[in-house]
Amino acid sequence: MLFRSTKRALEAGKSVCTSNKELVAEHGLELMELAKKKKVNYMFEASCGGGIPIIRALNSSLTADEIDRISGILNGTTNFILTEMAESGADFDAVLKQAQELGYAERNPEADVEGYDACRKIAILSSLAFGAHVKYRDIYTEGITKITAEDMKYAKELGMTIKLLADSKRDGERFSAMVCPVMLGKDSPLYSVNGVFNAVFVHGNVLGDAMFYGSGAGKLPTASAVAGDMVDCAKHLGKTVMMNWSNRELEQVDRKEVTHPFFVRIQGNREERLPEVLETFANSKVVTVPELTGEFGFVTECISEAEFEEKAAKLEGVLGRIRIRA
């Protein structure tokens, strides 16, 4: 319905501004091509990052750069939940209920907590950053529903925090993208992004590193972004603002080839099970939390997803695993 009404408006020679990331991720390329044909504009700054002007930055300020990585905390609901879990020690269900009472989470929070919202946003941003067409359905996505209060205690012991990270990297004509909970160290610029705030990290071959930070949701930040697009449309009557999003497709790296360290929780006595763990995951670092008995954790070396899954299947009593990112 929304796609049809948007298409009719563009066909009638009217510019359209939207905050709907589902529509943009699914039909954005087609609608931009139609807008170009009709010499009008289809703008969607508010679809990613609320009031953070990341799309305009990618489309104008950073056009001299070849962007090879874009990643970020793109969902305020999940970031609020993970921040509260880390600070209060409460479990996921309790904090989700709190988020709903405060209006930070929908009655049906599935799109947020399962990572679908962040997935659509990183697909849009990747398409603009890489000048190609990245399909959100092809991005591996994992939500935060399995993150526990115990995971947070281990993260604290490691001097890290847990965030839902949307990450996309390009290497020549290949790219990899993933949305999943990760442990971040204090050296990460995203470590201190807390509450309902969002942040987008960009790396370009000329610019180097840059981070865009601000309110990722809410009526006023979204309204600010939509109003900015409306003004931009008014400034370009009869002229289409070119967007760096084409129908060219990059080769996607198989997720199982991607490498990083993993944090793993496992049942059992450390002294009894450690030889088995080290035989399976050599050179792993053991992590313990004094108040958690009958289990321990360990951090693996940097290995591929495929190798991790193969080795983890050999261990009984694995309670969970979280990727670790730099």
Protein language model regions, located:
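Short, small-residue-biased leader/transition segments that mark boundaries at the very start
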Residues: 1-2
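Beta-strand-loop-alpha-helix segment that lines the small-molecule cofactor/substrate pocket
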Residues: 5-46
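A generic structural signal for well-ordered alpha-helical segments
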Residues: 9, 34-35, 99, 155, ...
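Conserved active-site and cofactor/substrate-binding residues in soluble primary-metabolism enzymes
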Residues: 26, 49, 53, 65, ...
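Rossmann-like NAD(P)H-binding beta-loop-alpha module
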Residues: 36-117, 124
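Catalytic, metal-anchored helix/loop core of enzyme active sites in primary metabolism
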Residues: 69-71, 79-82, 86, 98, ...
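Substrate-binding/catalytic subdomain of NAD(P)-dependent oxidoreductase enzymes
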Residues: 96-192, 197-199
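A conserved regulatory-domain signal marking ACT and ACT-like small-molecule sensing domains
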Residues: 230-326
